[in-house]
């Protein structure tokens, strides 16, 4: 029989982070249901970004990447997966993407 797929867990702040990103003009596709270590969000904003969501209100041990997530992130050859723990951190990430884009156009 095929190996059991590990069920994906949706973090409590998922909806709020997605809404924050969309409010800031980011295209967001939730991949939280994919499981097996795949990141929670695929975002389009000055390129494509993969986000892993963790609930910042949980203890650090409960926010750690799972073995599946860590293996997936390490094997991924594209832009590094960003770990986001709150809507505020998501907004900071969008500001960072804006600054990166500006610095690219200035060179």
Name what the model sees in each region.
Residues 1-107:
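Catalytic phosphate/metal-binding cores of nucleic-acid and nucleotide-processing enzymes, i.e., regions
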């Amino acid at each position: 029989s095929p190996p059991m797929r590990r069920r994906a867990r949706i973090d409590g702040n998922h909806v709020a982070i997605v809404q924050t990103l969309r409010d800031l003009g980011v295209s967001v596709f939730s991949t939280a249901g994919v499981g097996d270590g795949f990141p929670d969000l695929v975002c389009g904003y000055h390129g494509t970004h993969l986000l892993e969501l963790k609930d910042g209100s949980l203890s650090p041990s409960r926010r750690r990447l799972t073995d599946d997530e860590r293996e997936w992130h390490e094997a991924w050859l594209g832009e590094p997966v960003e770990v986001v723990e709150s809507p505020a951190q998501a907004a900071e990430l969008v500001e960072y993407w804006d600054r990166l884009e500006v610095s690219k156009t200035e060179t």
